[in-house]
Structure formats: structure tokens, C-alpha cells
Regions:
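N-proximal low-complexity "stem/linker" segments adjacent to membrane-targeting elements
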Residues: 1-26, 33-34
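A conserved acidic beta->alpha catalytic loop
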Residues: 13, 23, 42-51, 97
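Conserved donor NDP-sugar-binding/catalytic core segment of glycosyltransferases
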Residues: 102-134
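Short, flexible, basic/aromatic active-site loop/helix in glycosyltransferases
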Residues: 122-123, 136-155
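Non-catalytic, C-terminal membrane-associated alpha-helical segments of glycosyltransferases
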Residues: 224-231, 238, 242-308
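Glycine-rich, basic loop-to-helix element that forms the pyrophosphate-binding segment
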Residues: 69-85
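Acidic donor-binding loop at a coil-to-helix junction in glycosyltransferase catalytic cores
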Residues: 155, 179-193
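Short aromatic/hydrophobic "clamp" motif used to bind/position activated sugar donors
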Residues: 90
């Protein structure tokens, strides 16, 4: 029986991926007799990723499965990987992350005795001092989400682990969300949102750790990233607003944050004068884009039925 399946999806990051894979090899070596498999999904790379993966696979003493998903989209790639994992625990990280050597040992300790569908996010530290401080999770103590709160940012897909039975309870990732998809982000938040609604236990644990070498060194790169996050969250709000009251609570919180920011004249984010207003603007874009997409789809379906 496989104890842990490590799932990584990659696209055109050959050099970065090699660093990630080497960290997996080290972590497996430290893990002793733990049964670990590696599942890598190449999401349409056009660089030397395939060649690097083939060489690395031959060098490993543990099972490595290489899959290809040519259709763009991180959620699509993850879904393909999830259809093939065999481990009791699935550990997802990104192709620009590096696992700490004791990652697998700490992960298995956290899930020891867990008997119900459970998701646990791990710590994400900066990998390069030149990178700006985004897409990190720095808290050094275990946490649980606030009941009824919107889970965005509580844990992140760059270091996310769960028992394999979570998939049957929650469903797979929504392929309309995430990198490479129509709504560019929030695929992990949507997954968490549905999981919590389905009764899955969600928690944060700081003891299984990755370093994130995201490479964003300029403010304009960070601003574009945060605009995408807002856009994705807005689309997620539109997806769930009619069926889940947590969305209304999240909207009230976002509006309150923006008003307090305007009144106080504070600048919570160094590169954006009014961050919460900036976020609201891009959330509105995402909200109406999702609503318009849904309306278009319904019209097409109606027209198809009329012609049938």
C-alpha cells in the first residue's frame, strides 16, 4: 500500500522542476521505509521538461508515474493526476517549490490516526531573498478556519495535502478556475469551499514545509498576480452566491475592509495605494465575467434544445 502520493503539475519550467524533483528525492531518502509514489503531470510543456522527467524517473528507486495533459489548465492537470494517485495521503506542491528534507516525515506524522476525510495545508516559506513576499504562508502555529468564513488564503495549493477519500466527498477541481483557465485563479479556494461545505476537516499545520521560488521580483508582477486572484475570487463568488450564504458574509467583509481603508487612509500593501478597493474592482470583473459566461452557456443550451 502506498502511504503518500506526491502530485506535481508542470508547464515549461524545466530548470525549476529539476530543483523540485531533487528535493523530492531527498525527502524520500529521509523518509526511510515509507511507501511513496510520485505522480507528475506535464501540462503541455514545449521546453525540455519531458526529457528532464524521463532522466529523473530512471534514477529513482521509488515509483514514478509520468502523465501528459495537453489541454492548458492547472485544474485539468491536477484532475488527471488525482485520477491516478494510489496513496492514502495526496501531497500537492508546485514546480517552483522545494520540499524540506523532513517534509514526508512531518506530513505522515500530521495524518497519523486521521480516519475521516481531511485537508491540511502546510507552511510556505520564501525560497529566494530576491523574490517579493507573496504566495507565502508564514504562520508558525497550527490553525483551524473560522467557522463560516471564506477560506481564501487559509491554506494554499502550493503545499496542500489531503486523504484520498476527500475527492469522493468533494469532487475534483473545477477546470474553469486556476492558472491557464478562463478565471485564472481560485481553483484551490473553490476546492476548499466545497470541501468545508461537505463536512471535510480543514486545518493548517506549519511542520511540513516547502520553499517557494516563485521568481516575482518586480511590483508589476505582483500587482498582476493579485489582480488575477481578485478576478478568480469574484468568479468564485458568482458561482456560489445563490447556494451558499458564506458568500454574502465574504462580500460584507470585503466591502467593510474597503471602507475602513478609505476612512483610515492606510496602505496595507506597499505596491497598491488602496489594496481592498483594488481587490474589489477585480472581483467585480470576475463576478460579472462568470455570470456572463453562465448566461451565454444557458442560451446556447436553450438554442440547442430548440433545434433538436
Amino acid at each position: 500500500m502506498i502511504d503518500v502520493s506526491v502530485l506535481i503539475c508542470t508547464r515549461d519550467r524545466g530548470a525549476s522542476l529539476s530543483r523540485t524533483l531533487d528535493s523530492v528525492t531527498r525527502a524520500v531518502g529521509v523518509a526511510g521505509d515509507m511507501a511513496v509514489e510520485m505522480v507528475v503531470v506535464d501540462n503541455g510543456s514545449t521546453d525540455d521538461t519531458a526529457a528532464r522527467l524521463a532522466v529523473w524517473q530512471e534514477e529513482q528507486a521509488f515509483p514514478v508515474m509520468l502523465l501528459a495533459e495537453p489541454r492548458a489548465g492547472l485544474a485539468r492537470a491536477r484532475n488527471l493526476g488525482l485520477a491516478h494517485v494510489r496513496g492514502r495521503i495526496v501531497a500537492m506542491t508546485d514546480d517552483d517549490c522545494v520540499l524540506k528534507p523532513d517534509y514526508l516525515l512531518a506530513l505522515v506524522r500530521r495524518f497519523a490516526g486521521v480516519a475521516t476525510p481531511t485537508i491540511v495545508g502546510g507552511r510556505i516559506l520564501p525560497g529566494d531573498a530576491a523574490d517579493l513576499p507573496v504566495t507565502l504562508k508564514l504562520e508558525d502555529h497550527p490553525m483551524e478556519p473560522v467557522p463560516g468564513a471564506f477560506p481564501g488564503g487559509f491554506v494554499m495549493g502550493a503545499n496542500l495535502a489531503f486523504t484520498r477519500d476527500v475527492i469522493a466527498r468533494t469532487g475534483r477541481f473545477d477546470t474553469r478556475f486556476g492558472a491557464g483557465a478562463r478565471f485564472v485563479a481560485a481553483e484551490d479556494t473553490d476546492f476548499l469551499f466545497r470541501a468545508i461545505a461537505a463536512g471535510v476537516v480543514v486545518a493548517y499545520d506549519p511542520y511540513f514545509v516547502v520553499e517557494h521560488h516563485h521568481g516575482r521580483c518586480r511590483p508589476d508582477e505582483v500587482i498582476a498576480l493579485l489582480a488575477g486572484y481578485g478576478y478568480g475570487d469574484g468568479a468564485l463568488y458568482a458561482k456560489h452566491i445563490l447556494t451558499d450564504r458564506r458568500i454574502l458574509g465574504a462580500i460584507r467583509r470585503d466591502l467593510g475592509d474597503a471602507l475602513r481603508e478609505i476612512r483610515a487612509g492606510t496602505r496595507p500593501f506597499p505596491y497598491i495605494r488602496r489594496f481592498h478597493s483594488f481587490r474589489l474592482r477585480h472581483m467585480l470583473r470576475g463576478f460579472f465575467a462568470y455570470a456572463g459566461h453562465g448566461l451565454t452557456a444557458r442560451v446556447r443550451l436553450s438554442n440547442a434544445h430548440e433545434k433538436a
